[in-house]
């Protein structure tokens, strides 16, 4: 007999990333921790530039509203430096998680000098060159998303390829934001797969290519969020595309990675490591 017990519904929890800067650090560390709990569905929200008491009180109002709406305490990851601002955030009806709590004191004790926190410094914004590298990389990723501008590929550090909805765009944006890497991406379409070879525009950049793979069941779920019940989202279509693109990766000697059970952070790290990419920041 088969087990007819219905699957237990996922727990839902709202999460806030609160920062006196861009919230990139809080979000990155928070994502890494939350990825360990796949049985929970997280609604993630960013509250950046909470750098004074007025904005802190506004943030508390938003957090408390979420607690009321969900009838559950949200999780709050923060990288706040100003004690007065942090104290206000800690009054919210939430599980407050100071990302740096306990870490700075241990580092200070080891180094024998006190920490001198600077608002925004945890996000790399105090270094103008890092800031410029980050912004330039993000602009590049956006301009070269989804095969939009192939003429800039000579400037790319990496070109991610894969079927539609296989994680190319978020990975490119993440690498740009976190590491200043100029990442482009190109979707391999059904027409390309029918030809069973790389699109002509990619051939001269083969050394920059990295392929993303995904399990067909996962791809079906993602595509159904966009076009439910369509041929595009059918298992047969997804399986056909993935088998075809795997053949291209093998025949063209393109390194690839199955990202089905991986977080964006893990995908980016593996891509960087495999291709030996140089991080401009971080």
Sequence positions of predicted segments:
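Short beta-strand-centered segment that lines the nucleotide-binding/catalytic pocket of NTP-utilizing
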Residues: 183-194
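Hydrophobic alpha-helical segments and helix pairs
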Residues: 96-146
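Metallocofactor- and cofactor-centric catalytic cores in central/energy metabolism, strongly enriched
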Residues: 45-66, 74-79
């Amino acid at each position: 007999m088969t087990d007819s017990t219905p699957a237990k519904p996922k727990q839902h929890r709202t999460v806030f990333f609160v920062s006196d800067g861009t919230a990139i650090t809080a979000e990155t560390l928070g994502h890494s921790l939350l990825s360990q709990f796949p049985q929970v569905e997280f609604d993630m929200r960013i509250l950046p530039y909470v750098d004074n008491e007025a904005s802190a009180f506004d943030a508390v109002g938003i957090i408390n509203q979420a607690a009321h709406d969900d009838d559950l305490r949200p999780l709050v990851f923060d990288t706040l430096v100003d004690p007065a601002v942090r104290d206000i955030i800690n009054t919210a009806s939430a599980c407050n998680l100071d990302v740096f709590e306990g870490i700075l004191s241990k580092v200070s004790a080891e180094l024998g000098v006190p920490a001198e926190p600077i608002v925004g410094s945890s996000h790399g914004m105090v270094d103008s060159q890092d800031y410029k590298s980050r912004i330039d990389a993000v602009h590049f990723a956006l301009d070269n998303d989804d095969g939009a501008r192939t003429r800039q590929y000579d400037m790319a550090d990496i070109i991610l390829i894969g079927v539609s909805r296989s994680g190319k765009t978020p990975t490119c944006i993440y690498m740009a934001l976190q590491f200043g890497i100029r990442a482009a991406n190109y979707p391999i379409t059904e027409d390309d797969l029918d030809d069973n070879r790389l699109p002509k525009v990619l051939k001269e950049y083969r050394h920059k290519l990295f392929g993303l793979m995904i399990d067909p069941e996962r791809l079906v779920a993602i595509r159904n969020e966009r076009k439910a019940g369509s041929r595009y989202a059918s298992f047969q279509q997804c399986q056909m595309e993935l088998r075809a693109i795997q053949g291209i990766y093998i025949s063209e000697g393109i390194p690839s990675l199955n990202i089905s059970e991986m977080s964006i952070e893990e995908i980016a790290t593996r891509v960087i490591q495999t291709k030996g990419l140089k991080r401009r920041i971080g």
